[in-house]
Regions:
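ATP-dependent small-molecule kinase catalytic core of the GHMP/sugar-kinase superfamily
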Residues: 2, 91, 98-164
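A glycine-rich beta-to-alpha transition motif near the start of alpha/beta enzyme domains, typified by
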Residues: 1-112, 161-164
Length: 164
């Protein structure tokens, strides 16, 4: 793998390696992405994000890859980091990012503070990509001596398990 420049950022505890590929493109294999994301031998991050050239609609295209090298459709915290870079660079207070599935509207609401609209979340379990069959009734977590039960799955571009 050849050398390349990147930015490492974090948003609410998630960290990202962000590669600006608008002018100079590099091809990264799944193995390369896993190596970059590796916390012991690589840079270390939750996700790798590519910033790609502006599309015909004026939006900047971005790609997200989890640390296992799998591509996902969106990440809220990662989108906020990319939006902050681009809005600072372009000296604007709003920008639209495009992923392969959606448009993400981003707005600067203060110094180093970005708000995004990721669209309507999907709560349909059958439409959320999970790798195994899951019995929601038996899925409980214990945190600080408190049991969290009755989770919901939601997809906003990347599947999440949430508790209300």
């Amino acid at each position: 793998m050849r050398e390349f420049k990147f930015i490492k950022m974090n948003g609410l505890g998630n960290d990202f390696v962000i590669i600006d590929q608008r002018k100079n493109t590099i091809s990264l294999s799944k193995k390369d992405i896993v190596s970059i994301c590796d916390r012991d031998d690589g840079v270390g991050c939750d996700q790798l994000i590519n910033i790609l050239p502006r599309q015909d609609d004026g939006n900047i295209l971005i790609e997200f890859f989890n640390s296992d090298g799998e591509e996902i459709h969106a990440c809220g915290n990662g989108s906020r980091c990319v939006a902050d870079i681009l809005m600072t660079e372009e000296n604007v207070n709003s920008i639209k990012l495009s992923t392969k599935e959606k448009t993400i509207s981003c707005q600067k609401i203060g110094d180093n503070c970005v708000s995004i609209d990721m669209g309507i979340p999907n709560f349909e379990l059958k439409e959320i990509p999970v790798k195994t069959d899951i019995d929601l009734n038996s899925l409980n977590f214990q945190i600080n001596n408190q049991v969290l039960a009755n989770p919901f799955f939601v997809n906003v571009g990347n599947p999440h398990v949430i508790f209300f």
